[in-house]
């Protein structure tokens, strides 16, 4: 899993004062999507989506809401208050989406190279990616966070993951 577009000059995320939990997910300034390769079997697709989300949550401030306590006081960890759509695309479209998103300084991009699902030791994953030219890397998923209108232009009309 790699963070491929973490611009130094443009911070992607929400300031604490922007986190308004009364807003609809469609009213949030930023949109978060994870696009998964439609050719993956269900278990690998779910794995790819989760692995793309992990570095996104760690790198983009303000995506998670506050913890929620139920009526008995049991605390449930915060979830993405802005929502996160998990979409599917064929591998060529996934690559094109990744390329478009990376070209935008106002978007955050994290990807899951296919090597992440074919290695069991993280140093092997690093070696596999490190010896592969960028154009030869296949992707299982890409996570994108950015201004709503920009993300919509990047992803087009992709369907939700079934």
What do the predicted segments below correspond to?
Residues 2-162:
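Positively charged, small/polar-rich N-terminal and surface patches that mediate targeting and assembly
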């Amino acid at each position: 899993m790699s963070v491929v577009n973490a611009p130094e000059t443009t911070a992607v995320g929400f300031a604490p004062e922007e986190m308004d939990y009364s807003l609809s997910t469609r009213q949030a300034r930023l949109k978060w999507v994870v696009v998964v390769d439609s050719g993956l079997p269900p278990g690998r697709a779910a794995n790819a989506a989760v692995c793309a989300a992990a570095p996104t949550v760690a790198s983009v401030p303000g995506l998670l809401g506050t913890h929620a306590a139920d009526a008995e006081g049991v605390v449930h960890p915060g979830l993405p208050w802005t929502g996160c759509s998990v979409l599917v695309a064929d591998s060529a479209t996934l690559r094109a989406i990744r390329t478009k998103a990376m070209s935008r300084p106002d978007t955050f991009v994290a990807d899951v190279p296919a090597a992440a699902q074919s290695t069991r030791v993280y140093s092997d994953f690093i070696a596999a990616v490190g010896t592969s030219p960028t154009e030869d890397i296949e992707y299982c998923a890409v996570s994108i966070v950015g201004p709503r209108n920009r993300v919509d232009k990047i992803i087009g009309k992709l369907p939700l993951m079934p």
